[in-house]
A protein has these predicted regions:
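Conserved PLP-enzyme active-site core in the AAT-like
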Residues: 2-16, 23, 33-39, 43-46, ...
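Active-site-flanking structural segment that lines cofactor/substrate pockets
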Residues: 47-77
Length: 244
């Protein structure tokens, strides 16, 4: 029994540096969120909700300002009517892509649920494809963004370059914020007007920076995941440039 106790202690001591790193990052991001609450002067009255009369909902307005400030975005849309991350991503793509525009995913194929949104799977009804949006993708190279191939794949019709930050259900590594920054910098040097969209699901607060801080124009995610702290049953957000 003593040998087992020693083994447990040895393993715990081995893991201490990793847990300290996680705790440090958690405190950093907690401070960032608290600073956002302070910046917008959120108060108890914001938690009272709305009766439905009138058009003003200060609690909702402040919540969206908090998200915008936290993610370093111009503006944010945070609503329970956005029921999931897929819904948020769909809204972001539909708002930026029109007939004959091309959507280019540079992290390989997205989630299965998004394949129906794009029009690759399913009956195509109300999909991007039905509205004349083209689709192309660039596979990862050894689990990383193949930047030279991405630059080559972009054409005159490419309107949005999309990055899926999380590995999702694949076996590949998730895309780090440093890698996202390298890809965005390289793309923007050649195509400064292209829109960079990042699917930020599962990626919020796992690093010190968020995609907008490294050049992304638009991000979207789910409140059911990291931002909801495991408490939210529904909701999603979109954040980024105000003109988008």
């Amino acid at each position: 029994m003593q040998d087992f106790s020693n083994l447990v202690e040895e393993v715990e001591n081995t893991l201490i540096p990793y847990f300290r790193k996680i705790e440090k990052r958690a405190l950093f991001n907690q401070e960032k969120v608290l600073n956002a609450f302070h910046h917008v002067k959120a108060s108890e009255s914001d938690l009272q909700g709305s009766t439905g009369y009138g058009y003003d909902d200060f609690g909702r307005d402040h919540l969206e300002q908090i998200y915008a400030h936290t993610f370093k975005a111009d503006d944010a849309l945070v609503r329970p009517q956005i029921i999931s991350g897929t819904h948020a991503i769909t809204l972001a793509l539909q708002s930026t892509l029109k007939n004959n525009d091309e959507l280019l995913y540079i992290t390989g194929s997205p989630y299965d649920t998004l394949l129906e949104v794009i029009g690759i799977n399913g009956n195509g009804v109300e999909s991007l494809k039905e509205y004349g949006v083209r689709y192309n993708e660039v596979e990862l190279r050894d689990g990383r963004i193949d930047i030279p191939k991405v630059i080559t794949a972009i054409n005159d019709n490419t309107k949005v370059v999309a990055i899926q930050r999380s590995k999702g259900y694949d076996q590949r590594p998730s895309i780090t914020i440093n890698e996202i920054e390298q890809a965005i910098t390289s793309i923007k040097e050649v195509y400064p007007n292209i829109i960079i969209f990042v699917d930020n699901c599962y990626g919020e607060f796992v690093e010190d920076k968020e995609p907008i801080e490294v050049g992304a124009d638009l991000i979207a995610g789910s409140l059911i995941k990291n931002p909801g702290g495991g408490l939210a049953k529904i909701g999603g957000y979109i954040a980024g440039r105000q003109d988008l």
